[in-house]
Amino acid sequence: MRPVALLLLPSLLALLAHGLSLEAPTVGKGQAPGIEETDGELTAAPTPEQPERGVHFVTTAPTLKLLNHHPLLEEFLQEGLEKGDEELRPALPFQPDPPAPFTPSPLPRLANQDSRPVFTSPTPAMAAVPTQPQSKEGPWSPESESPMLRITAPLPPGPSMAVPTLGPGEIASTTPPSRAWTPTQEGPGDMGRPWVAEVVSQGAGIGIQGTITSSTASGDDEETTTTTTIITTTITTVQTPGPCSWNFSGPEGSLDSPTDLSSPTDVGLDCFFYISVYPGYGVEIKVQNISLREGETVTVEGLGGPDPLPLANQSFLLRGQVIRSPTHQAALRFQSLPPPAGPGTFHFHYQAYLLSCHFPRRPAYGDVTVTSLHPGGSARFHCATGYQLKGARHLTCLNATQPFWDSKEPVCIAACGGVIRNATTGRIVSPGFPGNYSNNLTCHWLLEAPEGQRLHLHFEKVSLAEDDDRLIIRNGDNVEAPPVYDSYEVEYLPIEGLLSSGKHFFVELSTDSSGAAAGMALRYEAFQQGHCYEPFVKYGNFSSSTPTYPVGTTVEFSCDPGYTLEQGSIIIECVDPHDPQWNETEPACRAVCSGEITDSAGVVLSPNWPEPYGRGQDCIWGVHVEEDKRIMLDIRVLRIGPGDVLTFYDGDDLTARVLGQYSGPRSHFKLFTSMADVTIQFQSDPGTSVLGYQQGFVIHFFEVPRNDTCPELPEIPNGWKSPSQPELVHGTVVTYQCYPGYQVVGSSVLMCQWDLTWSEDLPSCQRVTSCHDPGDVEHSRRLISSPKFPVGATVQYICDQGFVLMGSSILTCHDRQAGSPKWSDRAPKCLLEQLKPCHGLSAPENGARSPEKQLHPAGATIHFSCAPGYVLKGQASIKCVPGHPSHWSDPPPICRAASLDGFYNSRSLDVAKAPAASSTLDAAHIAAAIFLPLVAMVLLVGGVYFYFSRLQGKSSLQLPRPRPRPYNRITIESAFDNPTYETGSLSFAGDERI
């Protein structure tokens, strides 16, 4: 077996050069120990004999030299070099001849680093894969291995990157990584998971398996142990947009567009440039030059966070532009067009810059001072007098992937009680001041002046609820000391303040369970024996003749802008050598309601600012400057109630023009007057609730040069302006017009307003690239090629049936060099088609026609009728049908006489067979001609029958006799006494003869 071992020695040395471990594990049950089955693949894992541990790194790269490099990083670098158990990290496939040096980075232990992702590129490594003992496999030589390999191995964690040492025939991967892959540092949960890197070649898929067999013999070759290492080569074919991907880790370098590709491609490029600098530094990219073709894109993103941060794209990347990534990683992606267009070009330069902490938040009722925002810088906090700092007083900016402060910003609070030793000057305030205090409080403050000095208390504000809340100030150091002020006993505050007989004051504040108010604010000053105390004026200043205020010192007071001096003398003096004291009380500065101001600059405040103003107030201020000047009003604070009104008048009384009238809160704004005077009126709602602290208004005013004109308007390209008058005073109108071929975009008419600003923004002239809509044509429809009518668009008109097109049926939009695009012709018209008329028809005999005309136009209708006793035979209405020539729809009708015999003769009923569409007049005539004779005949026969049957009492069947009837002579003796009849005379009755 020794000859076989000698033959395998070169192969073993080659494998060791690639980092393969040939320790023979114990084989059992078809699988070597230390191998885990994960998704069908063999993955190496730590064994009990070789526990998992961290790997330390060393580097031969020079220390990062930057102008703002912090020494904190140098300690981390030196610490990494001094460790003795460090190993080299396996290499990463890298593009040959990179634009910038590719060096490994040390792994510093940064503050709070475990919770922040750090950029790490995966690097490949090799590992031995134990298999089943095999003794019949022949020896394997490196020559049988394909030069294109896919190698999988465990990778120790860490952010370092190194250039690989490639074997003969191997090439670095140029396959761009997946877009969804974001390189991040492994956290504690990822320490045992291997990284996988690939060396991939584009070609046909081929699988090659090589076997390495080593044998050892003990004794007389009685026992043989064989270890076989199998390396599987997988060559995949990936059709990618283009072979370009680079990684950069130096402090600065250049990014150039790919120009000389190793292999041609028939699709566009999709290139990635990954940049990583030291944690604690950001990436700054400057555009040196860029020239892209239409359709190409360049995007820049910041990496290292939960999601990529878009920074810029090709529309933002202009020459000289600087883009900064807020993290220490950045990625640039370039996508180009396929041949034959060819890719565009660009040249970028990147460098690392030191990241900084955010500016710390200033505490309310306090301030902050910052030495530097870079790592190592500090921030110091302090509170206003009367407030105590809660939290760290000093913060330090720590270096990390994203620098941060070592603690949260503190806050300033008003404590409930406390002991103040060596009290010289300061304030004590109730908890929550200037807001309301809490219920059920019992606070005690002990003030102690330096030895040999006394204390003076000044009441800045005392506001207690009208119940059992109480403030007591005692002239001593305990609760048993005699009180010098008790809110239960004193209704008004002492304007002159309080003086202690010794060096102590004891202040007690107690509140009950109901009601709350703003509380108190007391200012204290310590002063020496034989001197007066230091005076104080709220919202004002003073100047003194001697800083220690001995007897004879004079002090002069003044108020801040917007405040007025009240209830005191402007000048006071320290008198009485035996018991030094001021001859007058200190004055007070208050924001008053109303006033006349003649200063060139000043402030107008709401009444009692910053305290709440009162209800139902009506205040008027007059501001006056020189006649040739004007006033600018800068309204910086406006927080009033919805029922309150603040009005500005452009003049010296309330009848002037109103500049503006406002209610409710409003942000910062300015007003300008056209006069040398302005009147300000404030009216508060008498029924509204009082607002809180700093609710009101703050108005700064300034005297400005007279300016009765609006700013001069510039000319616009491809157009001109026409003012209504030479001077641009209020009311002036300026009209803008464009040259032929251009149109106005925006408002063409601008007016100078009262505030001396223009009513609209400046317009522009834009090139006209389309024709106007030619409109619709009556009695037609149109077909358009483009709805916006650009140059070259067409419009076709088609007339409705019965109408004839007059003009061009197709209009085309043509461009003109000296004007706007114009249609090739005017819009056509659709006129009614002209047809020959029908000749007039004569009226039928015994009939009439309507209308009576000789010619009738196409579509006209003629109506016929007959005289009484005649019946119309034919159509009562006929129409002139359009045509070439036009003709009548039916022949003309005739009128026939109506007879009784014809009524019984069916042939005479032709008129009755006329269509129901005949006129109502003809039907009435026919009915009358038939039924009236019948009715007359019936009446005649009935009358005769009635006469003979009723009046004569005879049967209707008896006929009169032809001879006269005999009669007897009537004598005189008869009883007939009718004087009408006499003897021998004749009388007639009815139709009979007597």
UniProtKB/Swiss-Prot annotation:
The reply on keyword DNA repair is no
Q: What InterPro entries does this protein's entry cite?
A: CUB_dom, SEZ6_CSMD_C4BPB_Regulators, Sperma_CUB_dom_sf, Sushi/SCR/CCP_sf, Sushi_SCR_CCP_dom
Checking Pfam families in the record gives: CUB, Sushi
Q: Which residues bear sugar attachments?
A: 289, 399, 436, 541
What's the PTM story here?
Glycosylated.
Q: Where is this region: Disordered?
A: 28-50, 88-146, 171-191, 241-261
Q: List the subcellular locations.
A: Cell membrane
What is an annotated GO biological process for this record, any one? Answer: cerebellar Purkinje cell layer development
Annotated spans, O-glycosylated at two sites: 38-47, 59-63
Report TM segments.
926-946
Identify the residues that the record assigns to the CUB domain, covering every copy.
Answer: 416-527, 593-704
Task: Give me the disulphide-bonded residues.
Answer: 357-397, 383-412, 416-443, 532-574, 559-589, 593-619, 710-752, 738-765, 771-813, 799-830, 838-880, 866-895
What does UniProt give as the signal peptide span? 1-19
Q: Which UniProt keywords apply?
A: Cell membrane, Disulfide bond, Glycoprotein, Membrane, Repeat, Signal, Sushi, Transmembrane, Transmembrane helix
Topologically, how does it sit relative to the membrane? Single-pass type I membrane protein
Main localization is membrane
Superkingdom, taxonomy of origin: Eukaryota
- For bias type Polar residues, the affected ranges are 112-123, 172-185
**Per the record, what ranges lie on the membrane's Cytoplasmic side?**
947-994
UniProt function note: May play a role in cell-cell recognition and in neuronal membrane signaling. Seems to be important for the achievement of the necessary balance between dendrite elongation and branching during the elaboration of a complex dendritic arbor. Involved in the development of appropriate excitatory synaptic connectivity.
What protein name does the entry list?
A: Seizure protein 6 homolog
Q: What is the lineage of its organism?
A: Eukaryota, Metazoa, Chordata, Craniata, Vertebrata
